[in-house]
Amino acid sequence: MPQTLHVHSRVKDYDILFTDHVLKTLADCLGERKQRKLLFITDQTVYHLYQTLFEEFAQQYNAFVHVCPPGGQSKSLERVSAIYDQLIAENFSKKDMIVTIGGGVVGDLGGFVAATYYRGIPYIQIPTTLLSQVDSSIGGKVGVHFKGLTNMIGSIYPPEAIIISTTFLETLPQREFSCGISEMLKIGFIHDRPLFQQLRDFQKETDKQGLERLIYQSISNKKRIVEQDEFENGLRMSLNFGHTLGHAIESLCHHDFYHHGEAIAIGMVVDAKLAVSKGLLPKEDLDSLLQVFERYQLPTTLERADVSATSLFDVFKTDKKNSEQHIIFILPTETGFTTLAINKDDHQFVEKLDSLL
C-alpha cells in the first residue's frame, strides 16, 4: 500500500499518512513543532484502551490531554467551552497544536476547536475507527451539534495531516466496524461499483491486507471528490447519499438505537427506494444494497425506534443541504447520482416516506 496521499485544498494542502508506527509518524509530522505545546483530545474509551500510548506522548512532548465522554453528546458547545478553558489555562498560543485521537466525534470536535481558537491553530487527526478513517476525517469538515440538530455549527478547516493506522481497528467492536463499512458502501455504490462488489465479498477474519486495500481505495475516492468540490457545491453533495434521513434519525433517536453508520444505512435504503420508484435505479441494485447491509448486520428499517414520518419530515426542514423552499435528497442512479428537491410544504411526501420506512 502507498504510504501517503496528498490532498489539494483551496484552504490548505495536507497529507494522509498510512502507518503502523503512530508515534514515529506523529514525530515526523510535528518536525520543529515538537517543542511546542500539544493538546491531545480523545474520549474515555480510546484513552483507556491506549493509555500506554498517551503515557509515551507525555514523555516525548510538552503534552496535555483532554478526555471527553464517549458518544455524540460530546459534540456540543459546552464541550468546546471546556476545551477552550483548558487551552487558556495552559496558555496555548497560535503556534501550539491540537492532536485529535479518536473517532468521528473527537475529530469533528477537536477540529472545530482548532478552527476557532485564536481564529485557527494547527491540528493533526489520528482517527481510530473505520468510519473516521474512511470518511469523517477526510475533507476538512469540522463542527458540533446544536439544540439536537446534527452538525449545525461548523466550518471547513483542514488538518496539517491525517495519520491512518489499521492497528487501531483491532480493538474496534463489530458494530462500529459495520458502521465504517456503511460509509464505504455509500461511496462505492455511487462512485465505485467495483469497490462495492469487493466490500460485498470481503472476509474480514482472513484478509487484513484486503481491508487495508479497501480503506485506501475508499479514501482515494473521497480525496478525489473533495479535491474537485471542496465546498460541496456539486459532486461532493453525492456523499450525502443517505444523510438527509440519516441525520434526522440521529436527531430524533438515542445513540443506543442507531449509531451514525446505521442511521445512514437506513437513509441509503430509503433514498434507493425513492430512486427505484422514479425509474432512476434498477430494482436489482436496491436488492444488492439490502443484501450487503444484511451481511454486515446493518439495519434497513426503523424497527428499533418509534419514529413517525411526520417527525422526520419536520427535522428535514432544518437540514443544511436544503435550499430556501426545498428539502434535498441524494438519489443513486445506475450511473451515479442525482438530487431530488421536495417542497417543504409537500405533505403528500410524508405519506410516501411513511410507506418507504
Swiss-Prot record:
Residues holding Zn(2+): 183, 243, 260
InterPro entries: Dehydroquinate_synthase, DHQ_synth_AroB, DHQ_synth_fam, DHQS/DOIS_N, DHQS_C
Required co-factors: NAD(+); Co(2+); Zn(2+)
Keyword presence, Electron transport: no
Domain of life of the native organism: Bacteria
UniProt xrefs under SUPFAM superfamilies: Dehydroquinate synthase-like
GO terms under biological process: amino acid biosynthetic process; aromatic amino acid family biosynthetic process; chorismate biosynthetic process
CDD domains registered for this protein in UniProt: DHQS
EC number(s) given by UniProt: 4.2.3.4
Associated pathway: Metabolic intermediate biosynthesis; chorismate biosynthesis; chorismate from D-erythrose 4-phosphate and phosphoenolpyruvate: step 2/7
Protein name, entry field: 3-dehydroquinate synthase
Species of the source: Streptococcus pyogenes serotype M1
Gene coding for it: aroB
